[in-house]
């Protein structure tokens, strides 16, 4: 059997894995090899993603978000942090950064939430592609659509991978056009470990093509 299955539906992270190490992708996603586990960084990111999604859908109020994070953190972030970080007290720092972000969260003023955690399937270069748009926003003044992705990266780490991050947004923009018959005007990232710092670029048709 080949490492890449014809009928497999790819996410953006999986496309990256295939590009960087096809065999590693095969073991993790196709064979589901033992020993390849979620890490604490990913678990914390998933928890904050989920809480933001529940707020966007009206399941949680803004006031409930930090308490929900505090309650679920020990239940969902169960992995150990890397030793080199743990000895420096990073585990507590990571928790505190997430809590502070949610405690000070004030929504997305000036924007209307069109959809949250929007899962979709489309075709990329003849292969099935599956993605999840964290939030699709509409500018209340202009009516422009904005693709928003929540990221747990620090600003330094984000800058190192910034161009690659925006490639993901361009793939998501394809779905926005297919569903809403117009392209998003802006591609935005919400860096919640940086207090909700926003990084964005305008959508450019020539870069998409």
Go through the PLM ranges and name each one.
Residues 12-60, 117:
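Nuclease catalytic cores
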Residues 18-26, 60-78, 184-194:
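Short, compositionally biased low-complexity segments
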Residues 50-119, 123:
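A non-catalytic, helix-rich entry segment at domain boundaries
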Residues 2, 6-20, 127-138:
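An acidic intrinsically disordered interaction segment
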């Amino acid at each position: 059997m080949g490492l890449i299955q014809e009928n497999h539906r790819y996410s953006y992270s999986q496309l990256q894995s295939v590009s960087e190490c096809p065999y590693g992708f095969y073991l993790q996603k196709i064979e589901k090899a033992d020993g390849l586990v979620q890490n604490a960084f990913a678990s914390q990111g998933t928890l904050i993603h989920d809480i933001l999604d529940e707020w966007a859908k009206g399941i949680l109020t803004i006031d409930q978000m930090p308490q929900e994070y505090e309650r679920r953190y020990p239940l969902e972030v169960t992995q150990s942090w890397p030793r080199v970080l743990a000895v420096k007290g990073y585990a507590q720092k990571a928790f505190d950064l997430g809590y502070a972000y949610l405690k000070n969260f004030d929504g997305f003023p000036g924007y209307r939430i069109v959809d949250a955690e929007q899962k979709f399937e489309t075709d990329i270069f003849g292969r099935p592609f599956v993605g999840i748009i964290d939030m699709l926003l509409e500018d209340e003044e202009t009516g422009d659509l904005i693709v928003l992705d929540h990221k747990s990266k620090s600003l330094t780490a984000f800058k190192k991978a910034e161009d690659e991050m925006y490639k993901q947004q361009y793939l998501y923009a394809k779905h926005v056009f297919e569903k809403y018959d117009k392209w998003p005007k802006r591609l935005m990232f919400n860096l919640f470990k940086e207090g909700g710092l926003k990084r964005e670029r305008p959508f450019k048709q020539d870069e998409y093509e």
